[in-house]
Amino acid sequence: IGMLDINKDNISVDVARDTGFLVGFGIDVPNLNVMGSETDPRVIGHETSYASVEGGVTAMEHLLAREPDINVVYTINEPAAEGAYQALQNAGKTGVLVVSVDGGCPGIASVKDGVIGATSQQYPLLMASKGVEAIAKFAADGTKPSASDGLTFFNTGVNLVTDAPVDGVPSIDSDRGTELCWG
């Protein structure tokens, strides 16, 4: 497993996505607040992608230099995934599963095209509307927003988008993802 992060600064969104992927994949992460705290030998390394296509190419090249037989790549976002895919193609690698996060329309198109095997689709327009509702409610009567049950934040949901579903893992296909995508 190769990890393409934003950078090495442990930015909260980078850490949450990174550790969330690893835990979901069954990797023990001793410190959920620090990227790279895992010691599982299946994780070959973390590289900085700057969340860009160009950074994804460079980061993937570094991971391939370390482990040419890599077979799973996690990326912080879909532009980094596009770059990782380019580097894999340039190296003649096939059958490598690239997974990502965001679910914007270009990323869903990449799932449909087979560039990204799966992406976690978020809903920023729903996040924004719920935020505005919370502000209006607070302004009207002082009611503060509350976190979703069992969480420290308000959960607006997420869907895994893939055209290669796995039994036991809830997902939607790229056609449905296209109906729900943004950007």
Model-assigned labels for residue ranges:
Residues I1-G183:
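A residue-level marker of the well-folded mature domains of exported/periplasmic proteins
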